[in-house]
Regions:
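ABC family nucleotide-binding domain
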Residues: 2, 7-177
Length: 177
């Protein structure tokens, strides 16, 4: 389903100093189940997720999605991959404060070219215990509530894979479970 082969990512600072965030990483992710990446801060976990998710480009190596190399992806292929195949939950929520909670979730559907599904959005808001906040703006919510919006936004797309970078970091212990 998803595999990375000999993936290397090097960042170049303005002074010309290179930082190798990923060094010849190869991983085959299972079709089902959960995979957890563990490591110290700065060890490349977030970089790996960003590259696997098509949000950043590798310096070398390739990503293989359902047997097809990302080296052969057009921009349209990458857009489709990010909007339908992958769901993201980041450490930073990337919630739009100008939108209501429900409109932040609906945005994921809009990016897929799908209509706003109010019933599905209401169900997800109920699932993440945010039903009473549907019409509120995110800037009035706690960090944990914003994180739950991000989780609901990833789930509404029904992606084949959800990539989460510390998705429970802002949640209290009861909600995180």
């Amino acid at each position: 389903m998803l595999e990375v082969v000999h993936l290397t990512k090097i960042y170049k600072a303005k002074g010309g100093v290179e930082t190798k965030a990923l060094n010849d990483v190869s991983v085959r992710f299972p079709e089902k189940g959960m995979v957890f990446l563990l490591g110290k801060s700065g060890s490349g976990k977030s970089t790996l997720l960003n590259v696997c998710g098509g949000l950043d480009s590798p310096t070398s190596g390739e990503i293989i999605v359902k047997g097809r190399s990302s080296k052969n992806f057009s921009q349209s292929d990458f857009d489709s991959y990010r909007n339908t195949f992958i769901g993201f939950v980041f450490q930073e929520y990337n919630i739009l404060n100008e939108f209501t909670v429900e409109d932040n979730i609906a945005l994921a559907l809009e990016l897929q070219g799908k209509p706003k599904d109010k019933k599905a959005i209401r169900q997800l808001l109920d699932d993440v215990d945010l039903s009473s906040f549907a019409k509120r703006k995110p800037n009035t919510l706690s960090g944990g509530q914003k994180q739950r919006i991000a989780i609901a936004r990833a789930l509404i797309k029904h992606p084949e894979i959800i990539m989460a970078d510390e998705p429970t970091g802002a949640l209290d212990s009861a909600t995180g479970k």
